[in-house]
Amino acid sequence: MVVVTVFRSRLREGVELDYQSVALEMERAVKTIDGFLDQRFYLADDGERVTIVRFRDWDSQRRWAEYPSHREAQRRGREEFYSWYDIEVCEERTSHEFSFLEES
């Protein structure tokens, strides 16, 4: 089973540099969590940010949710960085992958 966290957000005006510093710190920290699988970041043309983080199981996801520096980053996010955010955490029920490989 894989647990997927989808974090969508919008930043307040003028916080980009401070936000990037904290985001980089969190990007490094989450990789230390036992059960962390991978993460991806996307930025839409309208400014919405999307972070997708995958964990091996619910215990791994919970360790991250309760990780002290992550809790502090969440607090700062609410107080300093975000004008809006939405978090969805769910179990991956199915997964399909396709990869086209050209012959050389």
What are these regions (language model features)?
Residues 1-49, 58-66, 82-104:
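Short S/T/G/P-rich N-terminal loop/turn motif that feeds into the first structured element of a domain
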